[in-house]
UniProtKB/Swiss-Prot annotation:
Disulfide bonds: none annotated. Its cofactor is [4Fe-4S] cluster. One of its GO terms (molecular function) is iron ion binding. Its EC number is 7.1.1.-. The keyword Coiled coil does not apply. Binds 1 [4Fe-4S] cluster. It catalyses: a quinone + NADH + 5 H(+)(in) = a quinol + NAD(+) + 4 H(+)(out). GO terms for biological process: aerobic respiration; electron transport coupled proton transport. This is NADH-quinone oxidoreductase subunit B 2. HAMAP family: NDH1_NuoB (MF_01356). NDH-1 is composed of 14 different subunits. Subunits NuoB, C, D, E, F, and G constitute the peripheral sector of the complex.
Amino acid sequence: MSDLQTQMDLEQQGVLFTTINKLYNWGRRSSVWPMQFGLACCAIEMIAAAASRYDISRFGSELFRASPRQADVMIVAGTVTKKMVPQVVRLFNQMPEPRYVISMGACATSGGPFRDGYNVVRGVDLYVPVDVYIPGCPPRPEALLHALMTLQAQIDVQSLQQVRWYGDDEGVVNEFPVPIFGAEGLEVPGIPGTADPVGGTPKMPPFVSPALGGKGERDASIKALEGNQPKPMLRAGTVTIEEVAHGIAG
């Protein structure tokens, strides 16, 4: 008699076989509590996913927490402005491990139609690591459910010997630097000058997703935009209408 047949016979008698990893992952995947972080119109679709038509509670994620201390996944839904980034990072640092991030919509992923604006960041992954990206403007509730199932699939294959929050945490970043919003833009500790200037391009690569084995480091395969000058910005009271018209005509 094969081991599989023996296992099936014992299961019919109420004896179940599993591993510590499967049991641990099953418990976590079945109760992924989200922290709502609705920043713009994508949050409406996130709210709709929790309503009766889509019923996100089928996946154990109906408890939207207002406290990061009780949340497992941060759903960043909407446009991330530079004034909001410090709050996003600060709340992410307060979440207990294991913690995950879902970037919902084009704005949270890359800035969306506002990516060239003076006040919008070009992706929340410049400041916190993202596990699952959801395209769309805005994504439908089904897309959020698919992202949740994708996150559950990532949890299913995790091993306690390899996850970054269990065991030896050497080299693992647990506290991400909280940016400071200054007069010229976002200043990130550890990055000289203004890391994300107002009206300019960020001078830093995104973080590596933990799903890809990241430990909180930035993606070295993407070249940082060193020396990139910010685009000229019109400040109130510094130019005249004639100067603006001359610039457009030129």
